[in-house]
């Protein structure tokens, strides 16, 4: 996933319409709404939110001050803002569900938005709902502290011309987990035999940002580790099945790297770098958190429709479906916001099914809807002539999914922030310790973290 560095701001469009009868009764036009929004991978994503907020601004007469910034910067600045008490009214953070919200909710730093959720409660995907509930240690209960806007799960992106150059077709790609990823090592060997300096696997393996952790945890689930944290919030790392899954996931991700099937630089990749390596045809395939790779090439018809393959999560080695981990990109309202009523009014408008669907379509469908009615009523999402979107919808919305584990216990947000599993991979690839040793060290650190987060 890529983040850019530009900022946008929209000014008021309809000050003269402040007395409009269409203004929401809960909004005071004299009070502007300050919004921070995560920057998109391409300009269409930024334009989509600018247009939506401008329309709400015009309808209500309430000025919106919008700042669009890259994801990591947004989280860093919001944490600092919450510490000094000078916060925006509304925030959309693509990775906030993992790296920000769980501990902010724990510390009672977010506004409960259950009343906003309730306006569309029957519309939301069940896993998206689970992914929006977090535990408040002060109140000793779970509540909705975010409003789901869009979601995603891991996808596989493959260059068809490269597998064909190696002598294979789409039908040759195996369906089960280990066989699937091993296939690209075979493709790698065949391309190298032809003198091509191309890597079979584009694994993100850096101890930073989000993609590496996403990849590890999908491998963890594929090997039976989905119960690493129980719904009660209890850490379950002493379970034999989970223990084995952690070791196997580490071994299966690091061994291809050590054998040269993954680019050496992958240990330093940020979230954009696997995309760039794919576009440069340095790698045959890469797991990616959205279909951003394909969507970014939409204007290049041959690449979008013929050359880039989007595939869902492989079956488990037992031939059974592996649940996807559904990441929910949320909106939230920090405590201390100056215009909470207007922020909630804006959110209620934004998540009306037709509004939310139109926004996601204007972003080119990089992320999935969080409302099942959108995919059922709008053929855009399951159009069989599009080789990417309907695969993403099937993987993330119609097949089994699970929430991230920080929805059960915010301690797991700290696990992700500290990059514990990615650091374990680095210890294997760079310090030559065994997967068993790396897993043992990681488990010890995780247990220490969980001691700080007791669910009542």
Task: List each language-model region with its residue ranges.
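C-terminal lobe and pocket-closing loops
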Residues: 291-304, 317-419
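Conserved C-terminal helix/tail region of periplasmic/extracytoplasmic solute-binding proteins
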Residues: 31-33, 63-64, 164, 189, ...
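Extracytoplasmic "Venus flytrap"/periplasmic binding protein-like
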Residues: 51-131, 164-167, 172-175, 276-277, ...
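Short, solvent-exposed loop/beta-turn-alpha elements that line the ligand-binding surface or hinge
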Residues: 112-127, 173, 192-193, 203-206, ...
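Glycine-centered hinge/linker elements that transmit conformational signals in sensory
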Residues: 182-188, 230-267, 309, 313
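Extracytoplasmic/periplasmic solute-binding protein
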Residues: 136-149, 154, 181-235, 283
């Amino acid at each position: 996933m890529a983040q850019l560095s530009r900022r946008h701001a929209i000014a008021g469009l309809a000050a003269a319409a402040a007395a409009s009868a269409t203004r929401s009764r809960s909004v005071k036009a004299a009070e502007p709404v300050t919004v921070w929004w995560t920057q998109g991978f391409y300009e269409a994503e930024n334009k989509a939110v600018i247009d939506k907020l401008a329309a709400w601004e015009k309808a209500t007469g309430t000025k919106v001050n919008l700042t669009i910034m890259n994801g990591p910067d947004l989280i860093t600045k919001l944490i600092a803002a919450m510490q000094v008490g000078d916060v925006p009214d509304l925030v959309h953070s693509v990775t906030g569900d993992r790296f920000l919200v769980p501990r902010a909710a724990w510390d009672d730093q977010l506004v409960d938005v259950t009343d906003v959720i309730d306006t569309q409660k029957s519309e939301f995907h069940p896993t998206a709902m689970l992914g929006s509930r977090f535990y408040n240690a002060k109140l000793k209960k779970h509540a909705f502290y975010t409003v789901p806007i869009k979601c995603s799960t891991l996808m596989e992106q493959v260059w068809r011309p490269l597998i064909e150059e190696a002598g294979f077709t789409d039908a040759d790609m195996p369906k089960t987990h280990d066989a699937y990823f091993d296939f690209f090592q075979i493709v790698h060997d065949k391309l190298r035999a032809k003198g091509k300096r191309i890597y079979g696997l584009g694994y993100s393996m850096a101890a930073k940002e989000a993609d590496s952790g996403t990849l590890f945890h999908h491998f963890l689930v594929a090997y039976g580790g989905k119960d690493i944290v129980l719904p009660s919030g209890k850490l379950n790392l002493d379970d034999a099945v989970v223990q084995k899954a952690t070791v196997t996931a580490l071994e299966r991700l690091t061994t291809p790297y050590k054998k040269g099937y993954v680019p050496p630089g992958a240990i330093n990749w940020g979230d954009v770098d696997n995309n760039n390596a794919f576009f440069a045809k340095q790698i045959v395939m890469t797991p990616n958190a959205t279909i951003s790779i394909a969507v970014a090439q939409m204007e290049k018809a041959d690449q979008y429709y013929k050359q880039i393959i989007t595939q869902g999560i492989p079956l488990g080695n037992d031939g059974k479906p592996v649940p996807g981990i559904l990441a929910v990109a949320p909106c939230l309202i920090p405590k201390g916001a100056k215009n909470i009523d207007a922020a909630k009014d804006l959110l209620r408008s934004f998540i009306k099914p037709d509004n939310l669907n139109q926004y996601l379509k204007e972003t080119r469908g990089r992320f999935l809807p969080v409302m099942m009615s959108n995919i059922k009523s709008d053929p855009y999402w399951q159009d069989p002539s599009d080789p990417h979107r309907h695969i993403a919808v099937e993987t993330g919305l119609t097949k089994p999914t699970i929430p991230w584990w920080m929805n059960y216990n915010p301690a797991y947000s700290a696990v992700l922030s500290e990059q514990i599993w990615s650091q374990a991979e680095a210890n294997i690839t760079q310090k030559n310790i065994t997967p068993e040793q790396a897993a043992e060290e990681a488990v010890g650190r995780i247990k220490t973290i969980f001691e700080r987060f007791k669910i009542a």
